[in-house]
């Protein structure tokens, strides 16, 4: 069985794991949205502590929607989203499109981009102070830049473009109308997504310089839940090696009424949101601080997020697996291993708290929004060293065995109805070698056993008459290049593919390759090569698809080399190879004031489209949210919509549909 191990072990781990290390013949080991809006490759920027706050005068930026009038936000900077921090403000547009979008300050249009996904139609204005404001999900660009874009579209014969401009090409004044608001790209409804970035492309909180008079906020953040989690193998919370979640029964709750028992190294987690006046949207917090017995332990401020690589690090800032399985977004109030962000202020423990037996710890959490509204939370931890007490229950009639992995700890849970006749120990096996684990504690009728996997991976786990195979093939450390190969696949991990150590789990069955679980997150892409067990006949129309739990398939692609196909992925999950031989569908649904086509594809999805009118190219715009292709108005460059026309659409597999029309 292939394995990967790190070269050294800290003294504490060695003392815990040495017996099994020697038994197995192993050497001791240790453990270390938003999509990008440009095709340019960036190297992740290293974190070096909290970033300096840019000096911007209060009132320098104009609110770009309805300036001078009361307005509302649909989302604030730093909201916790799957795979990204929300990078700016979502400004409401009265539920409609085509509101004027004003330049927030003097500067010049430095860039624009069009896409059916992500930011949609997006404009960038660079200002004399070096900052850039970003305006996303636009419906239309206005002014001379719109004409330059249209010429480029016809020159390249494609709608989606990215253009960069010099300082003197398209200057703008503060308050100049530069675009009309929209609902393009990944938007779920009409609004303006507005960002402020610095010269290094860090996303900055636009509210950090005094806010805007148009946006009022007198509402303090609201606590939804907090949690205490064991972070070391000897740690317990309420006597167990489990995260304990505490949900207030009344709102607001500022003092938790019950003392929480704990021991060992623990971390605090928080679920909370903020609201603005007269708006029901749940927004993010700007700052969270933690003090223990009056001394600072941890703080973070979401005013500066590196883009694009830093924003995906939200998956390490929150408990990603808990969010995926329990639907509750808990942000860690400690800096977890592999978290590259620089928005934290901590001491040497990085926000972790070591709880000792018999001592009391008063924990104060302070939640703040960008307008200075504050909500406190206070709770008490009391140190209680765990002790093993044997329990029995007549409710369990047969032995049972299951296991799970939390960080580096293997947690074995075994039901033992009769400890008098059966051994109370669980056994880890590797070949002919074995290690007996004594129970760490019991809960109801179950024994719980804890083992640090950095000491070596077992082949199987035995309890009484039950033996189960341990289905993790290798330990993959983060921070290094690592490879894994078997008869069905190859995996290639880069130095920044993983946030932290991975205990690799792969399988192949009935044409489906499973790599880990989607409950776990990747930082940068993982390279995979799939090795089909039979020859794939039509490779030109066959590709890799991500298969969800309900059997739905999403196109991934891949490059064929012989009978193997390689691709990159940002997600774990189930992958299959499928062949798409059916062309896309297209239907003309409107001629009024232009052409509107409804398009669809049964598997791989739309790849390209082209409309020729009288043999000349005519621009079409694609909107994936409602699966339509349509002509834009005005369009003074393309041919008029009269006479014979041909629409040609192609899917990702190369299947083509041609429709001839007489306009």
Labelled PLM ranges:
Residues 373-390, 465-487, 659-663:
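Short beta-strand elements
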Residues 476-478, 498-545:
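Proteolytic processing hotspots in large secreted/extracellular or virion-associated proteins
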Residues 34-132, 141-144, 158-168, 173-174, ...:
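Surface-exposed, glycine-biased beta-strand/turn segments
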Residues 173, 216, 231-234, 239-387, ...:
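Long, low-complexity serine/threonine/glycine- and acidic-rich segments characteristic of extracellular
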Residues 269-273, 410-417, 529-533, 594-602:
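Short edge beta-strand/loop segments characteristic of extracellular beta-sandwich folds
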Residues 17-27:
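Bacterial N-terminal signal peptides
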Residues 220-225, 388-397, 582-588:
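Proline-enriched interdomain boundary motifs that mark the N-terminal boundary
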Residues 453-464, 564-583:
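C-terminal beta-strand-rich structural cap/linker in extracellular carbohydrate-active enzymes
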């Amino acid at each position: 069985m292939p394995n990967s191990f790190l070269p050294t072990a800290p003294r504490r781990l060695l003392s815990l794991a040495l017996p099994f290390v020697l038994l197995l013949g192993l050497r001791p080991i240790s453990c270390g949205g938003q999509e990008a809006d440009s095709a340019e490759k960036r190297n992740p920027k290293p974190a070096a502590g909290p970033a300096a706050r840019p000096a911007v005068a209060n009132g320098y930026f104009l609110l770009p929607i309805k300036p001078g009038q009361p307005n509302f936000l649909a989302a604030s900077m730093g909201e916790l989203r799957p795979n990204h921090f929300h990078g700016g403000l979502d400004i409401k547009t009265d539920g409609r499109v085509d509101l004027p979008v004003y330049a927030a300050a003097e500067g010049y249009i430095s860039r624009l981009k069009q896409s059916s996904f992500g930011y949609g139609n997006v404009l960038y204005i660079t200002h004399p102070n070096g900052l850039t404001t970003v305006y996303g999900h636009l419906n239309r660009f206005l002014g001379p830049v719109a004409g330059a874009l249209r010429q480029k579209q016809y020159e390249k014969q494609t709608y989606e473009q990215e253009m960069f401009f010099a300082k003197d090409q398209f200057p703008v004044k503060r308050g100049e109308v530069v675009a009309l608001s929209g609902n393009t790209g990944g938007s779920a409804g009409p609004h303006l997504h507005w960002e402020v970035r610095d010269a290094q492309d860090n996303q900055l909180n636009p509210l950090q310089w005094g806010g805007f008079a148009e946006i009022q906020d007198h509402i303090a953040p609201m606590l939804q839940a907090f949690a205490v989690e064991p972070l070391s193998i000897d740690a317990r919370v309420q006597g167990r090696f489990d995260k304990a979640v505490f949900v207030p029964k009344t709102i607001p709750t500022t003092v938790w009424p019950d003392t929480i028992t704990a021991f060992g190294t623990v971390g605090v987690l928080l679920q909370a949101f903020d609201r603005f006046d007269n708006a029901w949207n749940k927004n993010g917090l700007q700052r969270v601080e933690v003090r223990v017995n009056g001394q600072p332990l941890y703080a973070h401020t979401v005013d500066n997020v590196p883009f694009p690589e830093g924003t995906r690090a939200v998956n390490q800032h929150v408990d990603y697996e808990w969010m995926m399985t329990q639907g509750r977004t808990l942000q860690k109030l400690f800096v977890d291993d592999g978290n590259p962000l620089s928005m934290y202020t901590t001491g040497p423990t990085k926000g972790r708290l070591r709880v000792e037996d018999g001592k009391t710890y008063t924990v104060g959490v302070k939640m703040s929004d960008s307008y200075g509204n504050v909500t406190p939370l206070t709770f008490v931890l009391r140190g209680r060293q765990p002790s093993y007490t044997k329990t029995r229950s007549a409710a369990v009639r047969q032995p049972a065995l299951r296991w799970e992995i939390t960080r580096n700890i293997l947690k074995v849970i075994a039901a033992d109805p009769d400890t008098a006749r059966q051994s109370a120990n669980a056994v880890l096996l590797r070949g002919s070698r074995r290690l007996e684990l004594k129970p760490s504690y019991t809960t109801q009728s179950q024994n719980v056993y804890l083992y640090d996997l950095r000491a070596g991976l077992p082949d199987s786990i035995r309890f009484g008459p039950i033996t189960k195979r341990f289905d993790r093939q290798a330990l993959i450390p983060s921070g290094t290049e690592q490879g894994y190969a078997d008869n069905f696949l190859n995996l290639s991990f880069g130095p920044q593919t993983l946030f932290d150590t991975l205990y690799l789990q792969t399988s192949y069955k009935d044409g489906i390759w499973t790599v880990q679980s989607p409950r776990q997150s990747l930082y940068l892409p993982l390279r995979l090569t799939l090795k089909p067990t039979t020859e794939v006949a039509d490779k030109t129309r066959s590709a890799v698809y991500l298969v969800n739990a309900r059997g739905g398939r999403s196109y991934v692609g891949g490059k064929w080399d012989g009978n193997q196909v390689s691709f990159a992925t940002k997600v774990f999950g189930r992958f299959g190879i499928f062949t798409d031989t059916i062309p896309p569908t297209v239907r003309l649904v409107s001629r009024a004031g232009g052409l509107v086509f409804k398009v669809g594809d049964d598997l791989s999805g739309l790849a390209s489209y082209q409309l020729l009118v009288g043999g000349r190219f005519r621009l079409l715009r694609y909107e994936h949210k409602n699966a339509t292709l349509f002509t834009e108005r005005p369009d003074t460059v393309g041919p008029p919509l009269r006479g014979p026309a041909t629409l040609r659409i192609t899917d990702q597999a190369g299947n083509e549909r041609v429709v001839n029309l007489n306009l």
